[in-house]
Amino acid sequence: MEEAKRRDHNKLGREMKIFTTVDVIGQGLPLIMPNGVIMMQELQRWIEDEETKRGYIRTKTPLMAKSDLYKISGHWDHYKEGMFVLGDEETDKEVFALRPMTCPFQYYVYKAEQHSYRDLPLRYGETSTLFRNEDSGEMHGLTRVRQFTISEGHLIVRPDQMVKEFKDCIALAQYCLQVLGVEEDVTYHLSKWDPNNREKYIGDAEVWNQTEAHIRQMLEELNIPFTEDVGEAAFYGPKVDINAKNVYGKEDTMITIQWDALLAEQFDMYYIDENGEKQRPYIIHRTSMGCYERTLAWLIEKYAGMFPTWLCPEQVRVIPISEKFHNYAAKVEAQLKENGIRCSVDQRSEKMGYKIREARLARVPYMLIVGAKEEE
């Protein structure tokens, strides 16, 4: 328990000036401090570059939409209680809601042009800010928040492309976990519908059973151990959830990949096949790394603040042995920064031992002690 307390991101993240919270701003609305912003920017650059290498194209879509959009998607009927609604349908001409997901917006990017079967698959990616009206009792640090950033994306594919593209999404998620050094810390779940609670879902039993069978077969072919969780599917399709536990043993979903054979019809999405006929595509909803805030919390606890160097807010601290070498230390700092290294100089009139101890407490991976020998 003591080790869990030491690693708890809600405590350590504040100590390391990664994030903070303020009562007058509200629960589930953390302020990301400069150190945390550096880490999130590094993660975002890496993820977006990797998605680009894998054929994703970027979109930038609004943070809100009229209720009409969510009525088409089904979210108004199945997820309204989890949304921040702006206005009253009984009194206002138009009612808006902050978006809890990006999918319907990217569908209209797709619908803005006519597509041939040769154009597919189309892989849309967006670093999205989303809003979900979580219960106040669920709020915790960075793992459960009301506004968050996510590496979201949607693949529009032909039915014959679905299995390959779904497997590729799993491969991308596994690559991200591997780079972050956490691939051994996750569990895989096939989240299924609950046929005894039909009102929670759209579509018929045959579609649900078929899509669940496809995902089950893929996971088995990839030799991925998984559990099957009834009632955990999205209302429009089953999914693979990749989960991890925090230091206290509570499990959270980090990455989700969903099979959707239904919403293309809701939005009248189609492509033209080789015979000139309209056909419905399938959709994959997926994240590469999931929610940035939750990933940050996970990494804080995983590494107890001793992050991989590429993620560290401060990578190098230059410590001159006396005031005489301050100018040289500043030159070293400038040279490091020119080469893209995040660094600082400790010019305080403190003892060397104190400065070194402070750098260690700040979890700076490298210290450069400079004096006459180094200047020569």
Predicted regions mapped to residue ranges:
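NTP/phosphate- and nucleic-acid-binding module
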Residues: 1-376
